[in-house]
């Protein structure tokens, strides 16, 4: 892989579609390798905008606006970081030959909604998953639940992230509200939902899976140590690495992750979500990009998930080794403000082996993720305690 000088005619140009906190870290990782980065998001001053060479705010589902920007910037790589994209245009762009979509257009199209990836995993690859059905009306949702899925169950938009639009219901009386919430709260209103039966699992993990080129130029699949995480209302609030697992469960998790990522193809890092009970493992979801629970790797690994993604998409070798047990804990905005001020940062950083990342989002909401605390220790439990302590020490106030 040749890498040219940024801001010159020979620059290696990468365009990120989606420039939130995860995209911001990918941009920084790419720039450390001498790449010229163009950050795109739906709103101005997104976290990634603040560190990129150039930044744009457009509707990325609009094929005309997206085409104009791609033609203007002429990137070598396009790296989707969100689901709400016009993937048909991306397919046309990649077919033209000059620009490569990371990891592949197929991966982006299938993972942008839960129906595509669930049908691939369960029906084509025959991987174990929770019982599921798709519904395009309240009545068909009710029928799916009552004819086999049962209670409790989860209702989710076919296209959403960070828990948006998700509900857990335990009775027929909750179906109408869950349908309305899921059908309208996703990234794009699809008018369709997935209903999943509840699995009796011990814990859930994210297995960061990297497809990269080895020294001979062959695609090699590597696995980071499993990441455990705690969720509230479908959104991650805490993660840790490594998550203890039996050798058999870990092997099965890696087999599932390998099967899914090989089918999706391309180069890059994938966040594969799995449920685990004893030695049993079920596939849940996959993201063809760094995962929010993987932010723990900024402290626990020699190369974070963002470094690994940057290296892999550029065709460079990767090292997935764990440096030290680590944990992350979310820092919330706590209030609605466009002038948020963080206090207590010095106290948070006084916690042993701690660090924080403040994302720089231009607008805060009470439950919006505005930062993350990181910590390492001799063992995971101590790291988790340190990360939680550091996160709680960071306070917010309105600066107006």
Curated annotation (Swiss-Prot):
Q: Which residues bind Mg(2+)?
A: 273, 285
Q: Which PROSITE patterns match?
A: ATP_GRASP
Spell out the GO cellular component terms annotated for this protein, sorted alphabetically and separated by semicolons: cytosol
Q: Which GO terms describe its biological process?
A: 'de novo' IMP biosynthetic process
Pathway where this protein functions: Purine metabolism; IMP biosynthesis via de novo pathway; N(2)-formyl-N(1)-(5-phospho-D-ribosyl)glycinamide from N(1)-(5-phospho-D-ribosyl)glycinamide (formate route): step 1/1
Answer whether the UniProt record assigns the keyword Magnesium to this protein.
yes
Q: Where's the ATP-grasp domain?
A: 119-314
Catalytic activity annotation: N(1)-(5-phospho-beta-D-ribosyl)glycinamide + formate + ATP = N(2)-formyl-N(1)-(5-phospho-beta-D-ribosyl)glycinamide + ADP + phosphate + H(+)
Gene Ontology terms for molecular function: ATP binding; magnesium ion binding; phosphoribosylglycinamide formyltransferase 2 activity; phosphoribosylglycinamide formyltransferase activity
Give the residues the record marks as binding ATP.
114, 156, 161-166, 196-199, 204
In short, the EC number is 6.3.1.21
Which residues hold N(1)-(5-phospho-beta-D-ribosyl)glycinamide? 21-22, 81, 292, 361, 368-369
SUPFAM superfamilies from the UniProt entry: Glutathione synthetase ATP-binding domain-like, PreATP-grasp domain, Rudiment single hybrid motif
The record's Gene3D superfamilies line, in alphabetical order, gives: 3.40.50.20, ATP-grasp fold, A domain, ATP-grasp fold, B domain
* Alphabetic keyword roster: ATP-binding, Ligase, Magnesium, Metal-binding, Nucleotide-binding, Purine biosynthesis
Assembly description: Homodimer.
Query: Belongs to which family?
Result: Belongs to the PurK/PurT family.
What is the annotated role of this protein in its UniProt record?
Involved in the de novo purine biosynthesis. Catalyzes the transfer of formate to 5-phospho-ribosyl-glycinamide (GAR), producing 5-phospho-ribosyl-N-formylglycinamide (FGAR). Formate is provided by PurU via hydrolysis of 10-formyl-tetrahydrofolate.
Protein name according to UniProt: Formate-dependent phosphoribosylglycinamide formyltransferase
Which organism encodes this protein? Methylobacillus flagellatus (strain ATCC 51484 / DSM 6875 / VKM B-1610 / KT)
């Amino acid at each position: 892989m040749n890498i040219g000088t940024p801001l010159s005619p020979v620059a290696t140009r990468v365009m990120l579609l989606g420039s939130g906190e995860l995209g911001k870290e990918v941009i920084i990782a790419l720039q450390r390798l001498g790449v010229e980065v163009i950050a795109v998001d739906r709103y101005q001053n997104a976290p990634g905008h603040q560190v990129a060479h150039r930044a744009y705010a457009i509707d990325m589902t609009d094929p005309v606006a997206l085409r104009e920007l791609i033609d203007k910037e002429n990137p070598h790589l396009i790296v989707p970081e969100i689901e709400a994209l016009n993937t048909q245009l991306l397919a046309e762009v990649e077919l033209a030959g000059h620009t490569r979509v990371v990891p592949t257009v197929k991966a982006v199209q299938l993972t942008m909604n839960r129906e595509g990836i669930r049908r691939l995993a369960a029906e084509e690859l025959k991987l174990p998953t929770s019982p599921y059905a798709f519904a395009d009306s309240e009545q068909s949702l009710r029928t799916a639940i009552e004819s086999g899925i049962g209670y409790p169950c989860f209702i989710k938009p076919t296209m959403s992230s960070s828990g948006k639009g998700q509900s857990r219901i335990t009775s027929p009386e909750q179906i109408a509200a869950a349908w309305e919430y899921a059908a309208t709260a996703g990234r794009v209103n699809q008018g369709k939902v997935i209903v999943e039966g509840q699995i009796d699992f011990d814990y859930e993990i994210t297995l960061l899976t990297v497809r990269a080129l080895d020294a001979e130029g062959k695609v090699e699949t590597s696995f980071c140590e499993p990441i455990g995480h705690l969720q509230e209302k479908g959104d991650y609030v805490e993660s840790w690495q490594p998550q203890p697992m039996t050798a058999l469960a870990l092997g099965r998790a890696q087999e599932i992750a390998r099967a899914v990522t090989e089918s999706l193809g391309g180069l890059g890092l994938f966040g594969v979500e799995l449920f685990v009970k004893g030695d049993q493992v079920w596939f849940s979801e996959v993201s063809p990009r760094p995962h929010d629970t993987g932010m723990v790797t900024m402290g626990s690994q020699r190369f974070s998930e963002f470094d690994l993604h940057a290296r892999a998409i550029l065709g460079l070798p990767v090292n997935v080794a764990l440096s030290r047990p680590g944990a992350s804990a979310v820092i919330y905005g706590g209030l609605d403000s466009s002038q948020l001020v963080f206090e207590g940062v010095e106290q948070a950083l006084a916690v042993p082996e701690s660090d924080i990342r403040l994302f720089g989002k231009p607008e805060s909401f009470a439950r919006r993720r505005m930062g993350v605390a990181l910590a390492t220790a001799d063992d995971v439990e101590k790291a988790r305690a340190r990360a939680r302590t550091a996160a709680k020490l960071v306070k917010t106030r309105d600066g107006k």
